[in-house]
Regions:
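Conserved GNAT acetyl-CoA-binding A-motif
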Residues: 100-112
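Conserved acetyl-CoA-binding loop-helix of GNAT-fold acetyltransferases
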Residues: 84-99
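Active-site rim helix/loop that mediates acceptor-substrate recognition in acyltransferases
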Residues: 28-49
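Conserved beta-strand in the GNAT
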Residues: 51, 57-66, 73
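Conserved acetyl-CoA binding element of GNAT-fold acetyltransferases
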Residues: 70-82
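Short amphipathic alpha-helix that is part of the acyltransferase structural core
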Residues: 1-33
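Alpha-helical elements of Rossmann-like donor-binding domains used by nucleotide-donor carbohydrate transfer enzymes
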Residues: 14-18, 37, 91, 95
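Conserved active-site alpha-helix within GNAT-family acetyltransferase domains
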Residues: 111-119
Length: 119
C-alpha cells in the first residue's frame, strides 16, 4: 500500500538521492546540488511538494509543483523503479490533476517529466 503526503525536511536526503543525477553526472556532486535544490523547494512552495511512501515508509516517488498565476510549472516528477511503482505514478497523477482542474494558464513541464506523466 502506497501513501502520498506533503514532503517534510526529513525527506530531503531520500529525495536528493533519488534525483542526484538530474543535477550532475557525478553522483556526489549531484546529490549535494539536489539536496540544496530540494530544501529551496520546501522553503518556496512547501504546500506543493509531495512524496509517495511504500508500506516500509521508504520514499518511492516525489513531485514538486510551482502553481503560479501566469505559469503552472511541474518542477520535478520522479518515480523510483517505475515498473514496480506504477501505483505511485497513479497517486502523483491524481494529485496533479486536482491542481489542473481550474488552471487557465500555461503549464510548463520538462520533457522527462512529461514522458512519465503520459506513460
Amino acid at each position: 500500500m502506497l501513501e502520498i503526503r506533503n514532503m517534510r525536511v526529513e525527506d530531503v536526503e531520500a529525495v536528493a538521492e533519488m534525483v542526484a543525477l538530474d543535477h550532475d553526472s557525478d553522483l556526489e556532486k549531484g546529490y549535494k546540488e539536489a539536496r540544496e535544490h530540494t530544501l529551496d523547494h520546501l522553503k518556496i512552495v512547501p504546500d506543493h511538494c509531495y512524496v509517495v511512501e511504500d508500506r516500509d515508509k521508504q520514499i518511492v516517488a516525489a513531485m514538486i509543483l510551482h502553481p503560479q498565476e501566469k505559469v503552472f510549472e511541474i518542477e520535478d516528477f520522479h518515480v523510483r523503479d517505475i515498473q514496480q511503482n506504477k501505483e505511485a505514478l497513479t497517486l502523483l497523477k491524481e494529485k496533479l490533476l486536482k491542481y489542473l482542474e481550474g488552471v487557465e494558464t500555461e503549464v510548463l513541464c520538462c520533457p522527462y517529466a512529461l514522458r512519465r506523466l503520459i506513460t
